[in-house]
Structures are given as C-alpha cells and as structure tokens.
Amino acid sequence: MAEQNLLSEINKRRTFAIISHPDAGKTTITEKVLLFGQAIQKAGTVKGRGSNQHAKSDWMDMEKERGISVTTSVMQFPYKNALVNLLDTPGHEDFSEDTYRTLTAVDSCLMVIDAAKGVEDRTRKLMEVTRLRTTPIVTFMNKCDRDIRDPMELLDEVETELKIACAPITWPIGSGKGFKGVYHIHNDEAVLYKTGQGHKIQDVRTIKGIDNPELVDAIGDDLAAQLRDELELVIGASNEFDLELFLAGELSPVYFGTALGNFGVDHVLDGLTKWAPTPLPRETEDRQVVATEENFTGFVFKIQANMDPKHRDRIAFMRIVSGKYSQGMKMNHVRIGKQVSISDAVTFMAGDRERAGDAFAGDIIGLHNHGTIQIGDTFTQGEKLKFSGIPNFAPELFRRIRLRDPLKQKQLLKGLVQLSEEGAVQVFRPLINNDLIVGAVGVLQFDVVVARLKAEYNVDAIYEGVNVNTARWVSSDDVKKFEDFKRKCESNLALDGGDNLTYIAPSRVNLNLSVERYPEVTFSHTREN
C-alpha cells in the first residue's frame, strides 16, 4: 500500500522552470500560472506596468525596486490532477550560474518568446543549457495582443536557431488590437479572447469546428477565411505532436496567447501536466537513481542567504530525486559523512514558507543551513552516492572589492563567502596578497552583491578594476610537476570560496601560453560541485 501511495504521489509531480529573454513576459506568465493553480487570488503586475503591486515571485528588495527576478524562487501548486513545482529563474539582462544550476533540478522547461521579437540572445544561451540534459521544452508565444511577427516565420526561426522541431497546438486568430483568440488545433475549437480580464481567470467562449457558422458571427467573414487558409497551411507544413520526440527534447509543442491578458496560459498548463515527464532518473557517480526507489535521495542545487531578514537565515534548496521526505527523518549528509535529523524543512510559495509535511520525488524542499551545506551536496538514507552534473562555471567578469571602512574586513569576508556558497558570485583570494576579487557571469551580479552586503551584513563596499580577464580551475595527477607549476605561477594563483586552486589570467594570451607551457596541468572551465 505504501509503495502504491509513493507511486501515485510521484506520478502527480511535474517540475519545470520558465526560461526566456528579459522582458519576454516570464514574470507575468509565472503570476498567471500561479493564478490558475489557485496559489494566489489576484495576479500582481510587475512594477513598471503602471501598478504598485509587486509580483509574488519577485521578493528581494532589489527585485522589487527594479522589477526583475534576481534569484530563483520555488512555488508549488495543484493544477487539475497534478502537483506542479515551478522554479522561477532570473529574467534580467545578466543572470548567474544560479540559472544554469536551476535547470539541473527540473524535468521540463517552458520557453516564453516575445512574439513581436522572436528568438533572442538569452533564450539561445538557456536552450544550450537545456540541451546538455535533453530537457523537454514547451513553447509559449507571448504578447499576441500586440503586433506580432508572422506566426509561421516564428516557428521557422525557433526550428532553425534553436534546433528543435515545432508542433503548433494552438494558432492565433488575428493579432494586436485585432487579436480574437486562438484556434486549438488538437481540440478542434476556437477559444475567444476578451480584453480587460488580466487579473482573473476568464470564462472563455469556445466554438467547436472551423466551419461552424458561429465562428463567422464571432470574428467576421474575412478573419474566418484567413484562419481557414492559415490552418490548412500550418497543418500541412508543420510537425504533428509526437510524445516520444517531445520527451527526447527534439520537438516542442507551441502555444500562442497573452500572459498579461491572461489568455492561453491554461492551454500551456494543460499541455505541461498532460505530456511533461514525471520525475526523471538522475545520474550519480556510481549508478542511476530512479524516482520510484523507496529510499530517499536528493541534491542541493542552490543556497539562498537571508530569505527572511527577520531570521538572518540561509536555506539550501534540495531537489528530491527518489523516495519520500517526512518530518524528523534521519538522512546521511554524504560529503561530510554525518547522519542528520531534518525536522524543519520548508516548502515554498515565493517567499512565503511553510513547514513541509511529506514531500516526494520531484519536490523541492528547503533545509535550514548553518554553513554546513554546499551546492552539489547529496543527502541519502544511508547509501554513499554523489549526484553529478551540478556545475560551477568560470566567471567572465572580474572586479576587486574593497571596504569604505577597513574595520569591517571580517564581515566582508564572511558575506562574500556566504554569497559565493549560495552561487550569487564567485570569490578569489590571490596567494600573493590580501586582495578579494569577485568574479561574475553578468554585470548585474556585481550590483546584487554590493546591495546585499549592505542590506544583510551592514558592509559598505566598492569595486575597482582588476587585471584579470579569465579564470580556470587547475589540477594535475603529476604531483612534482604541479608543485613546479605552482611555484612558477604563484602570482597568477588564487583560492576560490571553496579553497579550490584557480589560475587567474590577465589575458587570453597569457592563459593560452600557460596551457601550452604546462601540458600536465588541467585548466578547467567548469567545476563539478
């Protein structure tokens, strides 16, 4: 009976992230998804859209000020017969490794594209990351209530640029001010759009069949004729939906709508809950772990400091891979070889936290962390496993950080180490001096770090330029030659936040010369946590 219950709970789970270019409408669609999941009563509109209500999923001060999602938050809600775990990822111009790592914790992704602009740079980068694990992708063409590009052109661009086949499930009826709704190809019905219903769930009118006279009455002769022609073309020229190809990450079902107008979002949720995979198996260094295994396993993919300034706490986000978490259970923290009892794990509703009752494979739970948990840590019910594929990426931008008040050096170091463990930034301490160098994937991370040091650690810090162009983690199996390398290159060596030896290069030329000069040393662009 317990096994049956475990299976039934796991089969309900759908764990996905939303990926998009900034301003494609990701935070808005997150809101509307939560509205349909009854997780919120009324959707907040992102700041900058003429509203003083801040979006539910943007809860750090800096996010509230700027109207962007800086950290990943996790939201769980029921939808029809499924239980959905939605991981929200940063949607701003620069994003951090946090985003990459979040994508290791999901089983599918919803890609949001601004239908007026098509495929943009950030979407390309995020798709490359999903490709590493052949993640199934559902596509939502957003902002159809504005003037959009030709829908066939959009499908063609996604197929060409992102190397994924498209299978349209819905098709837009008109666009911009003339947007009338979508035709649901699978259900063979028109779903009509009403404006001014963005904050609540609409009672939509549906009309069955493309030749139904009611459709002509509703949208007019010309648009009905245009729709018939377009559908004939699109059904003839595009791919049919194929579940196997979708699960293999080779084909994406495509939906059209407007998140701001709260239209078409339920179609996406229907598709995700119907077709997206239940919790998938994960690789460890020794074997594959399957969701239905009775014993609990999970890995930490993110650490968030001070989610609640009242508590000054840190939460480790853990993806459960197999089995079941129940309050007070004992588990093995594999890296430190210690048995721990977890009685106060939490579940999330973007900043609102509740103590977790039972949680199952696919769920994300939060563990209170007093400095002992790191990104990539594995927890099990006894077995010594380490989940693989949770990466650190070499930063691309560097700054020296220094204090306005030199007496706060201890607090600065503490803050930087905590922020680096959380994945907000990387910290490097050169072997030859007391500098603190901060490395990031995107410029905004620097602003985030200074703002958080001030707000959470009461440290007033500023940046200076530093002669570092790139960094690589270094290692070697040849102890003697590695010692020789360390002696000769000491001025280019630093320790990162986890005390791993790193080569910091003033230029690409310098890095390439060192790689040639020391063939027995491995210079790594990524490091497994």
UniProtKB/Swiss-Prot annotation:
GO molecular function list: GTP binding; GTPase activity; guanosine tetraphosphate binding; translation release factor activity, codon nonspecific; translation release factor activity, codon specific
Top-level taxon of origin: Bacteria
One Pfam family per UniProt: RF3_C
Gene Ontology terms: cellular component: cytosol
Biological-process GO terms, alphabetical: regulation of translational termination
Chain sites annotated for binding GTP: 20-27, 88-92, 142-145
Protein's cellular compartments: Cytoplasm
Presence of keyword Protein biosynthesis: yes
Keywords: Cytoplasm, GTP-binding, Nucleotide-binding, Protein biosynthesis
InterPro entries given in the database record: EF-G-like_DII (IPR053905), EFG_III/V (IPR035647), G_TR_CS (IPR031157), P-loop_NTPase (IPR027417), PrfC (IPR004548), RF3_C (IPR032090), RF3_dom_3_sf (IPR038467), RF3_GTP-bd (IPR041732)
Domain tr-type G, residue spans: 11-280
UniProt similarity note: Belongs to the TRAFAC class translation factor GTPase superfamily. Classic translation factor GTPase family. PrfC subfamily.
Biological role stated in the UniProt entry: Increases the formation of ribosomal termination complexes and stimulates activities of RF-1 and RF-2. It binds guanine nucleotides and has strong preference for UGA stop codons. It may interact directly with the ribosome. The stimulation of RF-1 and RF-2 is significantly reduced by GTP and GDP, but not by GMP.
Name by which UniProt lists this protein: Peptide chain release factor 3
Naturally occurring in which organism (per UniProt): Pseudoalteromonas translucida (strain TAC 125)
